[in-house]
């Protein structure tokens, strides 16, 4: 006998359901508000002063005005009924409105994001420390660069700044959307704080780094809602080409009556206007601004703040990506794995001095050394180290350690740096130092040499692991024709092992901050565009030199000011996704341009026979779609020309499907889909519309 299966029902908290329902309801309301606002804006944008910024749609608007006026005048042609002019004018009006709606809808999404950011700019007060030590409470709007402010637990950080004293957990969810608080402390690369975020534990003293209107949130708001959006160079170039095409077709249409008069017949003005509108690239002309705005919007939704559309476009053209090993390719949590003594030294001696060099070292590596030594029960004098003077790690020296009171100098660091330091003090180098360092490097680890004055005791084996999926991601970049270069402070053997495991194309070992600039310039000298990530002040020059510099929001103010993109999630690997978004923007613009121009082929076969068949009967052979009548053919072509714009708005906003592949493969794929599709779709669309229109004519 089978036992009945008892299914336990998982109970969900009703309050959680209500929260989710409220969020969904708010999202729907926001979308509805954006659409309603876009509809109003599409009418407001009919102002000729606004329309002239888009020459293609401005020509369509002029066509609407001409045909609208003609609809109230006697027809010059007996073959054109009175309702034709008003019908053409209405179709042209809706063509312009659809184009305006596409742009307004894209702008509306940006303004919605700006409104949510403005909510985080509450009227807060700051505890300012005066020069005499007194604490005065002032409004955040009165703060100026250089003011020193104390922020306690539960208080809002009043403006952008850098921590100069203390350590605290900060809730940055208002900016990044990430609920987990982050640690901010004085010194290092994680001292930068953003106005509008909240201290959730402890207390910090910060120095203000921005004046009112110049804060990070202010910049975000102005970028996403700025009405005067600067067009990118590629957008300007494409707009110039499309405007030139429009001008050429305008000249053709204006001179056409001279040709027809010679043949002994006249073409009605409304028909000429219809011909012009169908010939010029109205589809891409109506969607061009929306594509650019939507591209910026996609980057922002990815929690990346782009300082300009140019930066997003540049990301799409990137040829080389410079990546830090630690934190980007690997997890960056290098932990002490084992100790290797050299010469006649013992593991206890290596552990003792390794621990002493790490007592004051608050880095994850330093802490891991202490934990390893304690786990192995190796004794060391902690008090001796605490009384000494800490020597912090620097990118230039690539060593850290402590100077004890009795004059003893203890160091741990990169092999070549410590060897050079020992030799400078007259010490000799044990023969097996390099041998054991090579062994660690070949294993993919990082060797740190431990030395006291002029004597080397041994090595610390630090082990790091490559993030899963990195090899596949780099392979995708390779398929796109993008070269990856890994920069690391590790020695060449360690760098080579990690590079091989991760699958990067090239690596630069023992890399210092100034070396990154040299790598970037070398690539740029070859005519390539370069992207890189960084978070420290020492990364700022390289971020400024790169064509796309992605700074981490957790990094220093100098790094964020030098970069042209800021990752609010502080995830260095996101540079790969940013490149993908940039490429998607360029591909969407190119694909819809191809589709728009290819559309003209079908329109030729609709309008040309309709215009000339009565005078030149042989033209009937071009009526391959077998359209009902000349008037139906013209109206069907115009209607398709208008309707295709709103149908393509979702594609313009979302972007075309993007798959990593070579430029030639992408070109072939898009020509097939949007080139051939741009020819076939209008034939089908115009014929269907003609059948419907034919029922009413």
Curated annotation (Swiss-Prot):
Q: Which reaction does it catalyse?
A: K(+)(out) + ATP + H2O = K(+)(in) + ADP + phosphate + H(+)
For this protein, the Enzyme Commission number is 7.2.2.6
Membrane spanning stretches: 55-75, 79-99, 245-265, 271-291, 605-625, 633-653, 677-697
An example molecular function term from Gene Ontology annotations: ATP binding
Topology within the bilayer: Multi-pass membrane protein
> What's the domain of life for this entry?
Bacteria
Enzyme active site: 324
Localized where?
Cell membrane
Check the record and name the Pfam families matching this protein: E1-E2_ATPase, Hydrolase
Q: Which UniProt keywords apply?
A: ATP-binding, Cell membrane, Ion transport, Magnesium, Membrane, Metal-binding, Nucleotide-binding, Phosphoprotein, Potassium, Potassium transport, Translocase, Transmembrane, Transmembrane helix, Transport
Q: Where does Mg(2+) bind?
A: 535, 539
Q: Which GO terms describe its cellular component?
A: plasma membrane
Residues holding ATP: 361, 365, 393-400, 412
Q: Briefly, what is this protein's role?
A: Part of the high-affinity ATP-driven potassium transport (or Kdp) system, which catalyzes the hydrolysis of ATP coupled with the electrogenic transport of potassium into the cytoplasm. This subunit is responsible for energy coupling to the transport system and for the release of the potassium ions to the cytoplasm.
**Subunit arrangement?**
The system is composed of three essential subunits: KdpA, KdpB and KdpC.
Family, per entry: Belongs to the cation transport ATPase (P-type) (TC 3.A.3) family. Type IA subfamily.
Q: What is this protein called?
A: Potassium-transporting ATPase ATP-binding subunit
Source organism (scientific name): Bacillus cereus (strain ZK / E33L)
């Amino acid at each position: 006998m089978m036992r009945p299966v008892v299914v336990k029902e998982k109970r969900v908290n009703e309050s959680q359901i209500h929260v989710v329902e409220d969020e969904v309801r708010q999202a729907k309301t926001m979308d509805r508000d954006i659409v309603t606002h876009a509809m109003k804006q599409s009418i407001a944008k009919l102002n000729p002063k606004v329309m002239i910024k888009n020459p293609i749609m401005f020509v369509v608007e002029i066509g609407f005005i001409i045909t609208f006026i003609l609809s109230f005048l006697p027809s010059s042609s007996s073959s054109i009924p009175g309702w034709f002019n008003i019908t053409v004018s209405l179709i042209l009006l809706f063509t312009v409105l659809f184009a305006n709606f596409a742009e307004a809808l894209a702008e509306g999404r940006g303004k919605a994001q700006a409104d949510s950011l403005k909510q985080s700019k509450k009227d807060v007060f700051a505890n300012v420390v005066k020069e005499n030590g007194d604490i005065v409470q002032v409004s955040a709007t009165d703060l100026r660069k250089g003011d020193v402010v104390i922020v306690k637990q539960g208080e809002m950080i009043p403006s952008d700044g850098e921590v100069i004293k203390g350590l605290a957990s900060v809730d940055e969810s208002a900016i990044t959307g990430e609920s987990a608080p982050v640690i901010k402390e004085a010194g290092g690369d994680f001292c930068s704080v953003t106005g509008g975020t909240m201290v959730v534990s402890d207390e910090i003293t910060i120095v203000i780094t921005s004046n009112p209107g110049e804060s990070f949130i202010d910049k975000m708001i102005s970028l996403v809602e700025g009405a005067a959006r600067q067009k990118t160079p590629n957008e300007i170039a494409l707009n110039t080409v499309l405007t030139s095409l429009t001008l050429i077709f305008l000249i053709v249409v204006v001179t056409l009556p001279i040709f027809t008069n010679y043949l002994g017949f006249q073409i009605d003005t409304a028909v000429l206007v219809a011909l012009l509108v169908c010939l010029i690239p109205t589809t891409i002309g109506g969607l061009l601004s929306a594509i650019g705005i939507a591209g910026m919007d996609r980057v922002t939704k990815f929690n990346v703040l782009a300082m300009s559309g140019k930066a997003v476009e540049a990301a799409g053209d990137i040829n080389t990506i410079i990546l830090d090993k630690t934190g980007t390719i690997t997890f960056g949590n290098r932990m002490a794995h084992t100790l290797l003594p050299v010469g006649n030294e013992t593991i206890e001696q290596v552990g003792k001095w390794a621990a002493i060099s790490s007592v004051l070292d608050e880095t994850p590596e330093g802490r891991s050394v202490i934990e390893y030594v304690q786990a192995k029960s190796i004794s060391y004098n902690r008090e001796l180290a605490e009384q000494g003077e800490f020597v912090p790690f620097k990118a230039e020296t690539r060593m850290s350690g402590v100077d004890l009171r009795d004059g003893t100098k203890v160091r741990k660091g990169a092999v070549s740096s410590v060897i050079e330091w020992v030799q400078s003090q007259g010490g000799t180098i044990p023969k097996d130092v390099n041998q054991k360092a090579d062994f660690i490097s070949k294993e993919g680890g990082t060797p740190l040499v431990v030395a006291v004055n002029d004597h080397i005791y041994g090595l610390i084996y630090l082990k790091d692991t490559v993030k899963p999926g990195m090899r596949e991601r780099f392979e995708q970049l390779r398929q796109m024709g993008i070269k990856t270069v890994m920069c690391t402070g590790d020695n060449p053997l360690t760098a080579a092992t990690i590079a091989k495991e991760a699958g990067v194309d090239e690596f630069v070992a023992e890399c210092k901050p100034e070396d990154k600039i040299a790598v970037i310039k070398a690539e740029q000298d070859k005519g390539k565009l370069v992207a890189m990530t960084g978070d420290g002040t020492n990364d700022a020059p390289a971020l400024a030199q790169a064509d796309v510099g992605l700074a981490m929001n957790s990094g220093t103010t100098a790094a964020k000011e030098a970069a042209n993109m800021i990752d609010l999630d502080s995830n260095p690997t996101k540079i790969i996704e940013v490149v993908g978004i940039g490429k998607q923007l360029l591909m969407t613009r190119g694909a819809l341009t191809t589709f728009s121009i290819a559309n003209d082929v079908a329109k030729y076969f609709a309008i040309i026979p309709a215009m000339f068949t009565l005078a030149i009967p042989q033209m009937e052979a071009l009526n391959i779609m077998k359209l009902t009548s000349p008037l139906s053919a013209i109206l069907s072509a115009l209607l398709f020309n208008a309707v295709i714009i709103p149908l393509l708005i979702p594609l313009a906003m979302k972007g075309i499907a993007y798959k990593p592949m070579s430029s030639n493969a992408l070109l072939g794929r898009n020509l097939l889909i949007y080139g051939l599709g741009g020819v076939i779709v209008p034939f089908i669309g115009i014929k269907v519309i003609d059948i419907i229109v034919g029922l009413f004519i």
